[in-house]
Amino acid sequence: MKKHNFSAGPCILPQEVLQKASEAVLNFNQDNLSLIEISHRSKPFVAVMENARSLVLDLLGLKNKGYKALFLQGGASSQFLMTAYNLLNKKAAYLNTGTWSSKAIKEATLFGELVEVASSKNNNFNYIPKGYHIPSDADYFHCTSNNTIYGTQMKSFPETPIPTVCDMSSDIFSRQLDFSKFDLIYAGAQKNMGPAGTTLVVIKEDILGKVEREIPSILNYQIHLNKDSMFNTPPVFSVYVSMLTLEWLSNLGGIPFIENVNNQKATLLYNEIDRNPLFEGLSVKEDRSNMNATFILKNNALKNTFDALWLDAGINGLHGHRSVGGYRASMYNALPLYSVQALVDVMQELERKA
């Protein structure tokens, strides 16, 4: 029996995607060659890359709107550096909502002045700041849409006359947004898209070419755009599985369909956290993440009993991040509703035993 996988990342992927990927590793396109041993410049893989990029723009509603999609290496953490290298000329504005935005701020300070427009650090990042001012003379505004560690998520995004850069690593393709509000989006694959190894960048090409510095080729967005994500050898397997996952999502009905499912999952779990007297949520209710629910036991003496119950129920990956503790249930796109119900059942069983 497959486990209920609440891992924060790498995370659960659709079963049909795993099946197709495993077949491709042995025999890709019935050519008696493995996907991971063919040339990345062969016609079969070039078709994979083109399809993956096209699916990204289709799903986000950005086709024919001046955007291009890139599949790069280095993880989303590499984008903390790369965005600033390519966009920060003098000053940038950053919203600090957690560990990942803090890391992005640290990297960006290497290239210019940083304005931290707001931060929720004062309360261990358990909320999203509101009502902050973004300086109009900044080169861009950077935010993180979802915070896996603390369980918060931006529900709206500020209107700003400057370019907006967003780290959507943990909630891209999970909800409907006007993605044309963003000039650059980046996301590590290993949450809602595929296995670790590739990073998606969706970029409006007209924001490039404005910094007064030489940019190393491997870190230069324009070079990667000119080479269609083939400047160097791409992470073939990760791109292929990401393509399969995007096809899966598209066939289901795209983002509108999966957003409805994600809302059902989050509502089910948060209702139980709020109802059950043994548990307490860690994030402010209005800013709760649909992707990552963080919570604790009010009585830590019940920890061993609860842990044994959820492990016996075939639940995986429920421990909270080491910097926060408690529990974290990550409910990415591929997690079925019945897995959330299994967790709720365990929480109710603990209540009966307590």
What are these regions (language model features)?
Residues 1-39:
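N-terminal "arm"/small-domain region of PLP-dependent enzymes with the aminotransferase-like
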Residues 3, 328-354:
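PLP-dependent enzyme catalytic core of the Aspartate aminotransferase-like
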Residues 9, 108, 120-172:
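Active-site phosphate-binding strand-loop segment of PLP-dependent enzymes
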Residues 14, 189-270, 284, 353-354:
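Active-site C-terminal subdomain of aminotransferase-like
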Residues 32-82, 99, 107:
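Conserved N-terminal alpha-helix of the aminotransferase class I/II PLP-enzyme fold
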Residues 76-141:
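PLP-dependent aminotransferase-like
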Residues 165, 179-190, 199:
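Conserved active-site segment immediately N-terminal to the catalytic lysine
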Residues 279-309:
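Conserved PLP-binding catalytic core of the aspartate aminotransferase-like
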